Swiss-Prot record:
DNA-binding region: 126-185
Organism: Ambystoma mexicanum (Axolotl)
Region span, Disordered: 1-38, 189-252
Keyword annotations of the record: Developmental protein, DNA-binding, Homeobox, Nucleus
Family: Belongs to the distal-less homeobox family.
Superkingdom as given in the UniProt entry: Eukaryota
Bias (Low complexity): 1-13
Matching InterPro entries: Distal-less_Homeobox_TF, Distal-less_N, HD, HD_metazoa, Homeobox_CS, Homeodomain-like_sf, HTH_motif
GO CC terms, sorted: nucleus
Chief location bin: nucleus
This protein's name: Homeobox protein DLX-3
Cross-referenced CDD domains: homeodomain
Amino acid sequence: MSTILTDLSSSLSCHAASKDSPTLPESSATDLGYYSTHGGTHSPHDYFQSQPYPQPINHHYPYHQFNLNGLGGPGTYSPKSDYPYGGSYRQYGHYRESAMAVQEPVSVKEEPEPEVRMVNGKPKKIRKPRTIYSSYQLAALQRRFQKAQYLALPERAELAAQLGLTQTQVKIWFQNRRSKFKKLYKNGEVPGMEHSPDNSDSMACNSPASPPVWDSNPPSRVPHPQAQPLPHNSSPSYLEDYNPGTTMNRTWRGTPAAAQLDAPYPSGTGSVLAGCWWKN
C-alpha cells in the first residue's frame, strides 16, 4: 500500500510541475480531453475550472481536416439543414406560397344594371331621361362640330365648362352627331353643315327655332344721311369769268348778317342814322 501511495503522489507532482512550468505551452481543449480520458483517478471538473471556457468547444470543422483549397474529405462540413437560418427561411418560403395561393383574383368592375320596373306584369327597363339642350348649347356644339368631329379630353372639358354640361353629355352628343352624319353620307345625302341643328338634330329641344349663330345676318344699320351734292354747271368752275364784285356780293348775300341788313328798317331809324353820321 505504501508503494502505491508514493507512486500516486509522484505522478501528481509530475503533472503539476508540467502544468505550471513556464517553458511548456498552455493546455488546449485537446489536452483537456487527453487528461480527462487518461487520468482516471481525477475528475474533469478540476481541469475545467482552470480554463477560460466553461466547457470544451464542439468543433464542426476540425482543424486537421480543414483545407483552404476545398480538398477536405467528405463529411467535413455539416449539412445545410443544420444551419440555424435554414428552417426559418424555408418557413418563410412556405408562407409566401400559401399567401399567394390564398390571394383572390382581381375582380373586374361591373357596370350597374339599369333599374327594372314591372309594367303590366312584364319587366321593363327604365331608360335614363333624355338630355334637353338649349338652342344656345346646340348652336355652340354644332359650330364646334364644324371645326372638328373629334375632341380631345382638354377640348371636351373646356367646351363642357363653357356650356354648363358634363363631359359625358358632350361626348354623347358628338357620337350621335357623327353617326347621323355617316348615315346621311352613306345614303348619298351630303348633309349641309350650315343647316340649323334645331330642325334636324334628334337631341334638340322643343323650344322655338332660332337662327344659328353662323347664319344670322348682322343687325341692319341705320343709313347715315349723305351730303347732297351742290348743283353745278356742266362747265368747269375754272372756265367761268372771274368777277370779284359778283363773287363777293353773292357770298355776302348768303350770310345771316346780310339777311338782317336787307330787312326793312322801322320808321324813324333813318333820321337817327343820319344824325349819327352827321355828328361824326
